[in-house]
Amino acid sequence: MIPYRALCSNIQFAKHVLPELNNQTNVVAMLPSAHMYGMMFEFLFEMTIGAHVHFLTRVPSPKIIMQALAEVKPNIIIAVPLIIEKVYKSKIQKIVEKGSVKTLLKVPVIDKMIQKKICGELVSAFGGNFVEVIMGGAAFNKEIEKFFWDIAFPYTVGYGMTECAPIIT
């Protein structure tokens, strides 16, 4: 049994680190509510700030998720790494692996301009209106994580377990 104080602690932490989220916030709920991670950060936290939660009514395939993100334009995205990796692979990876782009990403000054453009494309792919993508529930691909770090993509990888309601870090 998860104690109330553990749930409350997670909610207080989320309010502290994401003060910009409020009753105007939109969230697409794509994780199973039967799991603590989805229940906490796509439902309970949002209820305490009065946010608008948009539940997917179909199995969350990449196509359905992308349609929902484009339509809702969420202010925060809560996901497992696999979802984020699939979006990266379908929207960005082909661009980054082109020979000319690979070469230009090694040229000082030009690399920053290209990284900024790529980051903008990735942000647009996720609806273009979010403050952060928060991932947890599984390991995040190290190569993609390094790439996200390099382009200054706004993301956080959390660690937790259900017994901790669910976040630890």
Model regions: which residues?
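Conserved A3 ("GATE") glycine/threonine-rich loop of ANL adenylate-forming enzymes
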Residues: 82, 136-144, 157-169
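Short gly/Ser/Thr-rich phosphate-binding loop of adenylate-forming enzymes
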Residues: 105-153
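Extended hydrophobic secondary-structure segments that form protein cores and membrane-embedded regions
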Residues: 26-30, 132-134
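Generic hydrophobic alpha-helical membrane-span motif
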Residues: 38-44, 56, 143, 147, ...
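Conserved adenylation A10 loop of the ANL superfamily
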Residues: 1
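Conserved AMP-binding/adenylation subdomain of ANL enzymes
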Residues: 8-26, 33-121, 154
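Active-site lining segments that contact anionic ligands and/or coordinate catalytic metals
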Residues: 24, 50, 130, 150, ...
